[in-house]
Amino acid sequence: MAPVGVEKKLLLGPNGPAVAAAGDLTSEEEEGQSLWSSILSEVSTRARSKLPSGKNILVFGEDGSGKTTLMTKLQGAEHGKKGRGLEYLYLSVHDEDRDDHTRCNVWILDGDLYHKGLLKFAVSAESLRETLVIFVADMSRPWTIMESLQKWASVLREHIDKMKIPPEEMRDLERKFMKDFQDYIEPEEGCQGSPQRRGPLTSGSDEDNVALPLGDNVLTHNLGIPVLVVCTKCDAVSILEKEHDYRDEHLDFIQAHLRGFCLQYGAALIYTSVKEEKNLDLLYKYIVHKTYGFHFTIPALVVEKDAVFIPAGWDNEKKIAILHENFTTVKPEDAYEDFIVKPPVRKLVHDKELAAEDEQVFLMKQQESPARGPSGSPRTQGRGGPASVPSASPGTSVKKPDPNIKNNAASEGVLASFFNSLLSKKTGSPGSPSAGGVQSTAKKSGTEGEPQSFRSLTEQCCQTGQKTVLSNVQEELDRMTRKPDSMVTNSSTENEA
């Protein structure tokens, strides 16, 4: 079918119509070709457009809060090595519509404030507009959350001020961020939009999207860049309920303060758990949504107490006030640390109970204990005698409470018997004029006709158990024997004369 313009030309006459129709046909073809060329050019331009590079994620958090483990999990690695100072890794981003890949830089600052000067290597004045900030809070230690968030927010604010960004440029960043916060539109239920398709998610015309005024406590600390508050280790909520008697009121109080902080900075709030892999996919999608503009179709989640998600721009003070209705023992204006109290530390008492004696001291005591006598007196040993000699009395025991007194008395008795027997032996020999008197004395002492040898005396001494007497008895007997012999010889000579 010929174009309408050509049909009108044919009605003009028999000569000119053919020429006119050919000229109009050529112009129409050129117009069509230019239209197709513009369409193809636009498509090819979009196809050649790549995901922007140079995007940064800056992560703050205390030591042990799980920030490195969280980002390593988002990266797809199973185990990450803990660094020192300023850690670096990257997230792989894939645009399925354009089959394009890029990498998003991730900088993790050490939990020690000593390393905050390293931020200048991660974010500069030129790269600030391409940066997203993540504050990591440890839900297993909720009493540290608010203090930690305030501390790291102050560190970031101080770093931005040191960049000396021109005031007009900083105001542009703040206005753009405030507009994004106000233009938030909650995704409709059943929305089937591709989460990878790039572009703003809008509904209706621009005239319908009227920016609502901000509340009194909303965006009071506008940093000009998107902020994300991520609570890690949310699986510890059950432990808090069992060990620290946390109730729903405590959890609502914590959530209310977190959402209040997020309102001040225009931040989003996400509860995560690497252990249970909870909300990790949601966190990744929200990050690429805020950094690369991918469509995001997940609404706010406030039902589950350990899987909360509050996107930036959704919350307000009236929604937070719903949590206040469940407060019974605390008021919304009460200080956070007055209700979420740090549990007492019982480490000192625990260490005192487990204190052990030094191994070397214990071995020294064990080495010294066998050397002590049964009653504490030092042990003495005879010349060749045994270590202990039983007493002659069958009814007495070897160990006595105080054997010194009895041993001394026995020693004196042995010496007296020895001297008497010695005198009776020497003076009672045949031919002695005084033999009768001496023998009578010997009879009284019960030693007549029974000469006692040194062996019998030694055996008698052994029966007493006195090692001191045993060791010196031989010398004493020799000395005493020589002296009475001389006395008896002199006495016999005088009698004969």
UniProtKB/Swiss-Prot annotation:
Places the protein is found: Cytoplasm, Cytoskeleton
Record-linked SUPFAM superfamilies: P-loop containing nucleoside triphosphate hydrolases
An example Gene Ontology molecular-function term: ATP binding
One example of a Gene Ontology biological process annotation: centrosome localization
Modified residues (Omega-N-methylarginine): 383
Phosphoserine modified-residue sites: 194, 369, 377, 429, 432
One Pfam family per UniProt: DLIC
Top-level taxon in the UniProt lineage: Eukaryota
An annotated GO cellular component: kinetochore
Tissues/organs with expression: Ubiquitous.
Keywords annotated in UniProt: ATP-binding, Cytoplasm, Cytoskeleton, Dynein, Methylation, Microtubule, Motor protein, Nucleotide-binding, Phosphoprotein, Transport
UniProt keyword ATP-binding, yes or no: yes
Residue sites binding ATP per the record: 61-68
Residue segments, region Disordered: 187-206, 366-408, 423-461, 474-497
Residue ranges, compositional bias (Basic and acidic residues): 476-485
InterPro entries: Dynein1_light_intermed_chain (IPR008467), Dynein_light_int_chain (IPR022780), P-loop_NTPase (IPR027417)
Modified residues (Phosphothreonine): 427
Compositionally biased tracts (Polar residues): 423-444, 487-497
Complex and partners: Homodimer. The cytoplasmic dynein 1 complex consists of two catalytic heavy chains (HCs) and a number of non-catalytic subunits presented by intermediate chains (ICs), light intermediate chains (LICs) and light chains (LCs); the composition seems to vary in respect to the IC, LIC and LC composition. The heavy chain homodimer serves as a scaffold for the probable homodimeric assembly of the respective non-catalytic subunits. The ICs and LICs bind directly to the HC dimer and the LCs assemble on the IC dimer. Self-associates.
Record's function text: Acts as one of several non-catalytic accessory components of the cytoplasmic dynein 1 complex that are thought to be involved in linking dynein to cargos and to adapter proteins that regulate dynein function. Cytoplasmic dynein 1 acts as a motor for the intracellular retrograde motility of vesicles and organelles along microtubules. May play a role in binding dynein to membranous organelles or chromosomes.
Similarity comment: Belongs to the dynein light intermediate chain family.
Protein name: Cytoplasmic dynein 1 light intermediate chain 2
Gene that encodes it: Dync1li2
